[in-house]
UniProtKB/Swiss-Prot annotation:
It is found in: Secreted; Cell membrane. GO terms for biological process: adaptive immune response. Glycans are attached at N74, N170, N332, N395, N402, N563. This is Immunoglobulin mu heavy chain. The modification Pyrrolidone carboxylic acid is found at Q1. Residues 125-576 are annotated as: Constant (C) domain. Keywords: Adaptive immunity, Cell membrane, Disulfide bond, Glycoprotein, Immunity, Immunoglobulin, Immunoglobulin domain, Membrane, Pyrrolidone carboxylic acid, Repeat, Secreted. Immunoglobulins, also known as antibodies, are membrane-bound or secreted glycoproteins produced by B lymphocytes. In the recognition phase of humoral immunity, the membrane-bound immunoglobulins serve as receptors which, upon binding of a specific antigen, trigger the clonal expansion and differentiation of B lymphocytes into immunoglobulins-secreting plasma cells. Secreted immunoglobulins mediate the effector phase of humoral immunity, which results in the elimination of bound antigens. It comes from Homo sapiens (Human). Immunoglobulins are composed of two identical heavy chains and two identical light chains; disulfide-linked. It is found almost exclusively as a homopentamer in the serum. Membrane-bound IgM molecules are non-covalently associated with heterodimer of CD79A and CD79B. PANTHER family: TAPASIN. Its main location: secreted. Residues 1-124 are annotated as: Variable (V) domain, involved in antigen recognition.
Amino acid sequence: QVTLTESGPALVKPKQPLTLTCTFSGFSLSTSRMRVSWIRRPPGKALEWLARIDDDDKFYWSTSLRTRLSISKNDSKNQVVLIMINVNPVDTATYYCARVVNSVMAGYYYYYMDVWGKGTTVTVSSGSASAPTLFPLVSCENSNPSSTVAVGCLAQDFLPDSITFSWKYNQSQKISSTRGFPSVLRGGKYAATSQVLLPSKDVMQGTDEHVCKWVQHPNGNKQKNVPLPVIAELPPKVSVFVPPRDGFFGNPRKSKLICQATGFSPRQVWSLREGKQVGSGVTTDQVQAEAKESGPTTYKVTSTLTIKESDWLGESMFTCRVDHRGLTFQQNASSMCVPDQDTAIRVFAIPPSFASIFLTKSTKLTCLVTDLTTYDSVTISWTREENGAVKTHTNISESHPNATFSAVGEASICEDDDWSGERFTCTVTHTDLPSPLKQTISRPKGVALHRPDVYLLPPAREQLNLRESATITCLVTGFSPADVFVQWMQRGEPLSPEKYVTSAPMPEPQAPGRYFAHSILTVSEEEWNTGQTYTCVVAHEALPNRVTERTVDKSTGKPTLYNVSLVMSDTAGTCY
């Protein structure tokens, strides 16, 4: 095996000579056609060839440095020595030696360096040698389970510029996911940084409070403990959800108690169990991070206990206990003592959107009922002010985690009916209600109608020059009321809503009572350059025929009219 190892001083004073030794093995310079070269790489610059010596003692130098260089070999020691005189700071570099071999092709000799040493760093400075001073670098951002946590170390005021960083967990397990950055000369001394990227889940779930940074330097090795980011410590909120009265099934009749611990951090939960003597029938899910847009990461966990109806009605007390960070949190539940929870039935009457009316040619009325303890006795009905009852379809949801149900009652009226001038009432009855609950909706009156202005903006030339994508913008302004529908088409065919983004209507700053919105369609630059047409269809109740459109393509570069009557649904919704 061929190896080459460079050695020499790490720090040299200006105007002094520099002597570097290359010790090699695996070949001999007394063998024909064997050669050794010296090369250097100054900081931030390309490699620079310096000198070469051959097996027959012939030597060659760089033209710019030949007056300052000498090269010699010692066959008995397998060494090549390079001497550079009158050094100065520009000679600061990493110096390499490499074996040079040659081959003959088509009558020509080709020389190449096939094996290199690892290099030795030489700093030319009038300053005194000094070991680095270390400073920890800690991330200030909140940790996210799907991201990484960055910590680092700043090494400062060291000379010469020869430093090696390594990271370890608890002084034992080596960390490989590191990044090094080039040294920087500042005030005659050097500074360098090293960074390590750790998975957030390891930081939040592990027991390590710091990582160890080892720094090797010719003037002394040093160690620094870098603390890991502090994770917010939050206690769990423990809730128990009891089964509904009709929630027991089978033989013997059984149901489930659900215990949920939420909002805690860090992740570790030492135990989650119901009662003291429960040995079976318990299923505990894995701890999961809660979905949050901001703030510290918190966690939740759910445990389910299967219980018999006889035990539940026999006044047994069930206790869910959670141990977290040395503290105990618990919640009791029994058929005689139900945990406090808001179980009042609520009713929401949801008016139809203009988009649904425009697309289906019918007006759908929706009545949502929540927090039902049972579903078999619920009834939902819609009535109109003038013509009485409207046929209503009712759908029941599956049981929610808090052991309640929800139901939806839907009714449709024909679009031609006078929705704007009539009141519609949703009526809900249930055995838990002393009297029916009612919610009434009608279209707001007195709203001025203003039809929208539609502008279609082609892709910007600067974006097309990048040859990546093309963004077409549809700007809709000055309309009232705020309910508007926007759809994109390509060559007369509707595009999937996943392919574009439409903003919510927003008030016009200079026109009170009016609104604006925009929709953005992004296609590939290749598609745009084929000349395909793209159409923005805008529907609003103030428009003639309720719809208008603008079309653009590469050849026109400006919007034109386009017949998009097919965008409207061919099948009207069913009216009752």
